[in-house]
Curated annotation (Swiss-Prot):
TPR repeat feature ranges: 214-247, 267-300, 308-341
Protein name as annotated: Peptidyl-prolyl cis-trans isomerase D
Gene designation per UniProt: cpr6
Reactions catalysed: [protein]-peptidylproline (omega=180) = [protein]-peptidylproline (omega=0)
Family stated for the protein in its record: Belongs to the cyclophilin-type PPIase family. PPIase D subfamily.
GO cellular component, one term: cytoplasm
Lineage: Eukaryota, Fungi, Dikarya, Ascomycota, Pezizomycotina
Source taxon at top rank: Eukaryota
């Protein structure tokens, strides 16, 4: 989309539920009428529309999200895909179809047929060539791809996110903000990397680069955990695993020790993910991630103490799921690997008591049934 002319740049500040999520910065291609409509709806400068609502994206939501396709918003009148209004009136014609839907993060007009453009738009998350000739591409995301991915991967019901994805602020970028709009900036932990490897910019990814990035993400996760931000810590550990998954095995030109380093890091990230998932009461995930850690423990040459932690973490998850018998089995394995560990000993006592209490309750119920 190279063009010598200075293109408008706009932004959305996104909130998911009550959580501030981040900024999406967009650059508008010179499809003049379509781009001007979108720019003005970002600033709200046109005032009230014919439907009695402000011609402004602020406060509107992304009402339709389909993973591996797109995220859609812009209905600031009905909030459900049936409304919206352009600055020219309710609808305006398709301007041109010169730009193709050939990559993710393109900005395109939603419509209900030829010549029905209003205010609704979508951002692609994959190439969507079947939309060529039907929808007008008029911009692209230049920053905040991780925010788009976060929205794309939300839980939905009938394609609507279960939590509102709200544009809490929006507008046009000018001056230094314009110049800085496409610059990657680290988040609060210092993490400068895109959430998904497919969106990575900079040095080409290979096994060594992915190991380096995943190692840094583990450190960012540890720092978030120590600061008390468990959800962010878990997010960084899982992000690290995504980067490792890009190149699960080194190639023949990589250093020989890299294979063992990757396996050890994968074990640690799974085990740490289990720890934080349990603390967040995500016991199903906690058990799964501890199991993944244990599945890789021998290949990773994990120490007995670290394997004991993984068994312990899976036991805590099983206890949280009220599956105390499974928890006890894992705790007994952990005790073999780390005899005398006070945490394991205490958890065994706790689980045995839970089993005893459950059995007593079952006996009482049976006696009442047969009396």
């Amino acid at each position: 989309m190279a063009d010598s002319q200075r293109r408008p740049r706009v932004f959305f500040d996104i909130q998911i539920g009550n959580e501030k999520t981040g900024r999406i910065a967009l650059e508008l291609v010179l499809v003049p009428k379509t781009a001007e409509n979108f720019r003005a709806l970002c600033t709200g400068e046109k005032g009230m529309g014919k439907q009695g609502k402000p011609l402004h994206f602020k406060g509107s939501i992304f009402h339709r999200v389909i993973k591996q396709f797109m995220i859609q918003g812009g209905d600031f009148t009905a909030f459900n895909g049936t409304g919206g209004e352009s600055i020219y009136g309710e609808k305006f014609p398709d301007e041109n179809f010169e730009l193709k839907h050939d990559k993710p993060f393109l900005l395109s007009m939603a419509n209900s047929g030829p010549g029905t453009n209003g205010s609704q738009f979508f951002i692609t998350t994959v190439p969507t060539p079947h939309l060529d000739g039907k929808h007008v591409v008029f911009g692209e995301v230049i920053n905040g791809k991780s925010v788009v991915r976060k929205v794309e991967n939300m839980n939905t019901q009938a394609d609507k996110p279960v939590k509102d994805v709200t544009i809490v602020e929006c507008g046009e970028l000018t001056g230094q903000d314009y110049d800085d709009a496409d610059k990657q900036t680290p988040d609060a932990t210092g993490d400068p990397y895109e959430d998904f490897p497919d969106d990575h910019q900079g040095e080409e990814l290979n096994a060594q680069v992915c190991f380096k990035i995943a190692s840094e993400l583990k450190n960012f996760g540890n720092a978030a955990f120590k600061s008390g931000n468990l959800a962010l810590g878990l997010e960084k550990y899982q992000k690290g695993l995504r980067y490792l998954h890009e190149f699960p095995e080194p190639d023949e030109n990589d250093p020989k020790e890299l294979d063992g380093q990757i396996k050890a890091l994968r074990f640690a990230l799974h085990s740490n993910s289990s720890l934080l998932a349990n603390k967040l009461a995500q016991y199903g995930n906690g058990r799964s991630w501890a199991t993944y850690a244990l599945d890789t423990a021998n290949a990773a040459n994990a120490k007995d103490a670290d394997k004991a932690k993984a068994y312990y973490r899976r036991a805590v998850a099983s206890s949280g799921l009220k599956e105390e018998d499974e928890a006890l089995k894992d705790l007994q394995e952990a005790e073999k690997l780390a005899p005398g560990d006070a945490g394991i000993t205490n958890e065994i006592a706790k689980v045995k008591k839970a089993i005893k209490d459950r059995q007593a309750k079952e006996r009482a119920t049976a006696q009442k049934f047969f009396s």
